[in-house]
Every structure is written in structure tokens, then in C-alpha cells.
Amino acid sequence: MKAAKNNVYTVSRLNGEVRQILEGQIGKIWLNGEISNFSSPSSGHWYLTLKDTHSQIRCAMFKGRNQSVNFRPVNGQQVLVKGAISVYEPRGDYQLLLESMLPAGDGLLAQEYEALKMKLAAEGLFASETKRALPSNIQRIGIITSATGAALRDVLHVLQRRDASIEVVVYPTQVQGTSASDNICRAIELANKRLEVDVLLLTRGGGSLEDLWCFNNEMLAHSIYNSALPVVSAVGHEVDTTISDYVADVRAPTPSAGAELLSQDKGNKAQKLALMLSRLAQGMRHYQLSQDKHFVNLQHRLNQQDPKRRLQQLEQQFDEFQLRLDNAFKHRLSRLTLRHERLSAQLQRQSPEHKLRLAHQALTHVSGRFDDAIKDTLGSAEQRLKQAVHQLEAMSPLATLSRGYSISSNANGKVITDASKVKVGDSLHTRLAKGQLVSTVIDVEM
């Protein structure tokens, strides 16, 4: 069976194409695991294995990356890493090239945030075509926030200053804590059930990622997306961006900005401008997402031809060769040690005392075998003799005599087998099993 030339791969080609598939389709990922086999050669690069109870994967973190890690990894430590799937082509090893490393626990919220963001984006919750425009004539605003928070005071102050005619309905809720997401969802549901406002403003003041975590909830994202009322998300400060900001119809950077966006000022010019700015910002965000994806693709293509990657690969090869050289030296030393021990043993075996001991052992062994052979031979001969005697006795006429028969012969010693060969007056000798008889024929019956 012949293979087509274009279907026959070289090993290098196969490993190269596998690397391109892994890097192109999987890319960068977050991974949590336990460190084992950690090593740091003189090159400054780190090599380790990440494992869990069922699997493991090799990892490499080059010097330029691991200098930003603020702790020294140790075997058995649980860590969270970010890296790109790749293949170390010279050996065909599937590995992860690490970019960052954190002790387990740190950065998990950020990881969950990115994972949820990617999931909801794939489901279409951030799509611009699903965003609704804000009403042109807003008369009543529903505010979903804490009844005692600074955000509510800021919003009311801005609305009073810009347009005191706008009515406000507050849907008080928790905006921090484990039950806050459920409370916000119920507030959105209540507002949609009553339909007493034109638009909803979801807001709270700034805080840490943990403080704002309730706004990064999947159930809340779907509640905002499914709301019949337009939703403006104004959570935190300008640098804070939550999942609710991506799902909402409009995002405002602060609570005050959200109030300004929903209020009119001097003939509605400010509202129109804010709306335009909001749409522009929204368009810029989507454009940025598109450009980020394009940048990742370009970076991937560049990495495939990047001399730096080749240099990193050569450095990794150097570390591997150095390890192999060390192992070869140890193996050579081990072989020389074994050879020395073997030669010492051979020299010991060549000593006269050792030879005499071996000769005595051999003589004892041969003598024993000789005695056994004689016994076996005599026993076999004795058995054959007994069998021959038994066969001879079985064939001997004397055996017939022992059963009551007799043998008669004439005076010449000739055995008589026919009565016609005997005359009256002949002398006969009859052999019995024990003894014999001498008789004279007085009658012959035919």
C-alpha cells in the first residue's frame, strides 16, 4: 500500500502544525493547580509541572516573565497561572507558556469575572443591536440602589439641579453582600411589573472588586437583559466596569453622570449630547473589543514568526541539554563504579584459595552424581533381571508341571507325545512337578 507524498508528514511538520492548532484555537487560559518538579536553572527560566488529582501538564516561565512574580514557587504549592498553550517542537511536548502566577485564592475573582464576561458575550447579551434607546421625554425615573447610600443623594442632587420636574421612584435594595444580586433582581422585576417609570437607573458608589461583585452576577445580567424598561448602569467610579455595565442599554461612569444622562438641561441639548457621548463610548467599547480580538490574532501570527520565541525555545533546549549532560556524567560515573566492582570480583575469583574451594565443590558434586548414577544403573539392571526371570518362568514347561501335568519319555529320553509310539513292556520315565516315576507299559489304548 503506497501513501501519497502530500499525506506523509515529517515529525517537525507534524509538531509545528499541532502547535499552530493549539495556539490558534485555545490561546491563553487561566489554570489552577499544584506545583511539582519545579526547577530554576542558571538561565533564570522556570520549569515546573502543574497537576491535580487526575492529570498534569508541563509549564515553562521565561526569565522576562517570572521576574514579575513576587514570591518564590515551591513544590506542593497551589497557584493560579495564566498562559498560552503551545508545543515544545524539538521534543513534541505539549506545554503551557506562563505569563503570570498568583498564589491560589488571589485573582480568582478576576478570573471568574473574565470567564462570565466571555460566556455572556458569546450568548449575545452585550450585542449593540439589542440595546434600546432612552426615551426622548423622561418624566419619571426608577432608581435601584441603597436607600441610605451616597449614590442616591448624588443622583437626587443632580436631578434637582438640572430638572426638578422629573419624578423619582426609589426601589431600595442591597448593593453589596452575598444576597445583593438577588435583591437587585427582585427590584428590577418589581419595576417591570408596575411599569410606573420610563427608565431604570441601577447605581451605587465606588468600591473594591469584592464590594462591586454583586453587579458581576449572571442572574442579574439576564434580569437586566430581559427588562422591558431601558436600564442605565452607573456603578462605581469611572475606572470601574462591571458586567451590568456591559449588559445595560447605556452605561454611565458614575451615579452623578447617570443622573445627568437622564435629565434635561436647556432645551434637551445636554441630554442629546450625553446620549451621543454614551453611544460613542458604547461604539468605542465594541470597536475596542473588535480591535483587541484583531490584535490577538496579529500577535498570534507574529508569535509564530517571532525570533524571541525561537530564542526562548533555544534557551529551553540549552537547559535540556545541560540536564542531559549532567545525567550522562552521572550515568558514566555509575558505569565506571560498576565496572570497578566487577573487576574486583573477577580478581577475587582468580585467587588460589577461591579456585581450590570451587574445585572441591565441583569434586563433591561430581562424586555425588557418580554415586547416584551407579545406584540408578544397578537398580535398573536388577529390575530388568527380575522381568526376564519372570518371563522365563512363564514360558518354562516346568511351570506346566506345577499345574498337575506330567512329561513322559522312553528309555532313550525322547518325550512321548503319541501312544502309538509305545509298546507293552516298554519302560517309561514320567517327570512330575516334584520328582519322577519309572513305570512299565502293561496296556496301550488308542
Curated annotation (Swiss-Prot):
GO terms for biological process: DNA catabolic process. The keyword Secreted does not apply. It holds the Pfam family tRNA_anti_2. Its EC number is 3.1.11.6. One of its GO terms (molecular function) is exodeoxyribonuclease VII activity. The keyword Hydrolase applies. It is an enzyme of class 3 (hydrolase). Bidirectionally degrades single-stranded DNA into large acid-insoluble oligonucleotides, which are then degraded further into small acid-soluble oligonucleotides. Belongs to the XseA family. This is Exodeoxyribonuclease 7 large subunit. It comes from Shewanella denitrificans (strain OS217 / ATCC BAA-1090 / DSM 15013). The gene is xseA.
